[in-house]
């Protein structure tokens, strides 16, 4: 059952207890103010939103992300997705050849070591980001999990 609704959009709490799933929206198309307001209200309430079955270009992801506020920049072009300095490309696929990097590849290994530990994106900044947006292009059937925690709920439980 939907907890929040807007014409055609439904925001429903996920059964696993964290976040909500948003349905009835195509993020590759421009969003009305009302539709974005429903999504933003869902974000404020649940802190984690899942949008299934989306097909976005990097440009479309940036346009949607900008609705939430100013985006962080990643100045090193090798880290950027298609030249967008506000999108960090995270991949085990080599950009030039399209080959999958071996697990022992120094660049891949240093990245996975740095991200495999629990962390909160941008927590080191004076003003941390409001959110992180992930868009998976090729998701493995098993493994490669990204985990989330509701730190507000954890703090309130202390």
Predicted features, each with a name:
Residues 2-158:
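Non-heme Fe(II) oxygenase catalytic core, chiefly the N-lobe of the double-stranded beta-helix
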